[in-house]
């Protein structure tokens, strides 16, 4: 397994109160595989208000009940959009959305990677070559919400119990 180390620059300009990263302002050190989450509204896993809890609610068929349904959603601050997830692997990556925590990510555009979110707030990705990536243990948070999962290990496609690469963070 080869882990490329690259540096990328984002010329979005300086923003007030934006902190400089380890590589400097506007620069990103691309080192380890990771999964990032862009929270749309409320975090998907936020109890009773997040996408996982409200996505299956049925919209009433009567027009007056529909207005009441949507007004309740807006006024109570319940989530109307799923969070976007972006993952980075040594030989690629992708993005997508989870319909529920129980089903694999729907990648957009579609690819052959299998991305799963586990009950213990860890994630697993199996790439199209069968390599397995485990994320969790070390995470970045905004408030109480995880916004980035860092890779803990990469395992062989033929021998999943054999760890090829382990990542340790301070």
Regions found by a protein language model. Give the residues of each.
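Solenoidal tandem-repeat scaffolds enriched in leucines and small polar residues
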Residues: 166-170
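Conserved binding/catalytic microenvironments
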Residues: 162
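Long, intrinsically disordered, low-complexity, charged/polar and glycine-rich segments
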Residues: 1-152, 156-159
């Amino acid at each position: 397994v080869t882990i490329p180390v690259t540096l990328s620059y984002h010329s979005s300009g300086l923003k007030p109160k934006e902190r400089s990263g380890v590589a400097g302002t506007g620069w990103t050190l691309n080192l380890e595989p990771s999964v990032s989450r862009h929270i749309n509204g409320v975090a998907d896993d936020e109890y009773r208000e997040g996408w996982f809890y409200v996505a299956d609610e049925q919209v009433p068929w009567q027009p007056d009940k529909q207005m009441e349904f949507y007004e309740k959603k807006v006024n109570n601050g319940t989530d109307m959009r799923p969070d976007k997830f972006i993952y980075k692997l040594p030989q690629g990556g992708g993005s997508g959305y989870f319909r529920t925590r129980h089903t694999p990510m729907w990648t957009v555009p579609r690819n052959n990677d299998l991305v799963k979110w586990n009950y213990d707030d860890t994630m697993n990705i199996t790439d199209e070559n069968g390599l397995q990536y485990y994320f969790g243990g070390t995470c970045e948070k905004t408030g109480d919400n995880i916004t980035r999962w860092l890779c803990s290990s990469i395992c062989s496609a033929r021998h999943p119990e054999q760890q090829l690469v382990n990542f340790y963070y301070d």
